[in-house]
Amino acid sequence: MKESILAVLLYLFEYYFSENADLVRDRDSLQNSLIQVGFSPAEINKAFEWLDALAANRPTLTNPRVNGPVRVLHGPELDKLDVESRGFLLFLEQQGILNTEQRELVLDRAMALDQEELDLDDMKWVVLMVLFNQPGAEAAYAWMETQMFGNEPEQLH
């Protein structure tokens, strides 16, 4: 079975929110649990490195720029992110869900995944994980979580 970093991250993310989250308190215990579930040690280590980089690259809290410069994606980003993913990032930034620093962190974390291409669903998970890790982004995280798990999309005001 070909696992990916994203599969390990999704499992970690979903497990973190389960009632059993208190059972795993340290990295070694969590790694052993992931191995028992069937993930390879190599993919688990890559996922932990991905999370460490996410934690290390928290953007500073700044006011969002209004009508700032437009971010132009370059070759590898265009190759990896499908059109829907790119449009989704633009939408999130235009609606104030992501500021420019958070967008860059999302792009960095998306590019760090070991997949050749990311679709819209993959991008939504990356955004959700980045927002979860951002202090002061609770409202944006809650909105994003509603979009992913709610029955009806919530309107932005």
From Swiss-Prot:
Coiled coil: none
NCBIfam families with a match to the protein in the record: PRK03430.1 (NF002897)
Family according to the record: Belongs to the Smg family.
Protein name: Protein Smg homolog
Naturally occurring in which organism (per UniProt): Xylella fastidiosa (strain Temecula1 / ATCC 700964)
UniProt gene name: smg
